[in-house]
A protein has these predicted regions:
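Condensing-enzyme catalytic core mediating Claisen C-C bond formation in acyl metabolism
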Residues: 1-53, 151-225, 238
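Conserved beta-ketoacyl condensing-enzyme motif
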Residues: 18, 52-111, 223-238
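Short beta-strand segments
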Residues: 19, 83-84, 133-139
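A glycine- and small-aliphatic-rich helix-loop capping segment at beta-alpha/alpha-beta transitions
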Residues: 33-37, 93-103, 125-127, 148-157
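Short, hydrophobic/amphipathic alpha-helical packing segments
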Residues: 57-68, 114-118, 206-216
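Short secondary-structure capping/junction motifs at helix and strand boundaries
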Residues: 75-76, 127-136, 181-183
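Short, well-ordered, mixed-charge alpha-helical segments that flank or form enzyme active sites
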Residues: 89-91, 141-146, 192-196, 233-236
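Active-site-proximal alpha-helical scaffold in enzymes
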Residues: 108-135, 174
Length: 238
């Protein structure tokens, strides 16, 4: 069972592990520094579909299916999936995973959805509420532009501060099996509002919560330091 350490940290004694994971992306993402580690690269951003939203559903379903297969299980073995995306009602997710038949708990954490879904999945597994939980998320540059900025058809000029939303999806399978990567603690962040007024510069709005992780997690009366702080979507300006 999870044990609260201090005010913000949840210690997971059983240390749930990541038994399977997958990430699929679009062409632009494949040209970045992580291009050679993705499971699949879609050269066609439409993925053969008629809309950006439907394409995102294809990405999401593909990532979840690949992660489950790499974990050596079937969709029927998954007790729950925590998943979400950037769209209204998480439509990219719901239409993507509906055919898998996994009990679905929708998560809307914007750019924190992957971390939030993994946190929830880990807590459920550690609590023995379930044996196998899936955590996943997706986004698409074109559907996100329509949702948060301007539709591409509008032809608006991008500002120098505008981040580029990932076209892709990621998924993990969280279990109690002996895994190389384990989740020992969960820390839920607090809202940090620095009154950023530029709607294009989402990175600057999100960055403060990453650098203000205080108080540090406390374990056995000793303050712990973070070995690494990994984040995405903030860009150089953020």
């Amino acid at each position: 069972m999870p044990v609260r350490q201090g005010k913000y940290t949840l210690l997971l004694p059983s240390m749930p592990g990541i038994s399977g994971y997958a990430a699929v992306v679009g062409k632009k993402e494949s040209e970045g520094p992580l291009g050679n580690v993705f499971d699949y690269i879609y050269e066609d951003g439409m993925a053969g579909e008629k809309s950006w939203e439907k394409a995102e559903s294809v990405f999401h379903r593909d990532a979840v299916t690949r992660a489950i297969a790499k974990a050596g299980i079937s969709p029927e073995d998954a007790d729950v999936i925590f998943a979400g995306d950037l769209l209204n009602q998480c439509t990219g997710t719901t239409f993507g995973i509906r055919e898998l038949g996994i009990p679905f708990a929708g998560v809307y954490g914007a750019c924190s959805t992957m971390a939030l879904s993994m946190a929830m999945a880990s807590i459920w597994v550690d609590s023995k509420v379930c044996n196998t939980a899936v955590a996943s998320t997706s986004s698409h540059f074109c559907s996100a532009e329509k949702q948060f900025r301007m539709p591409l058809e509008y032809g608006g000029q991008r500002t120098p501060t505008a981040q580029w939303t990932v076209t892709g999806a990621g998924a993990t399978v969280i279990t109690q099996n002996d895994c190389g990567a384990r989740i020992e603690k969960v820390i839920i962040g607090r809202i940090q509002d620095y009154s950023i007024k530029d709607p294009n510069n989402m990175g600057a709005a999100m960055a403060p919560v990453d650098v203000k992780l205080t108080p540090y997690p406390i374990l056995h009366g000793r303050r712990l330091l973070y070995k690494n702080l990994k984040t995405g979507g903030l860009n150089n300006i953020g």
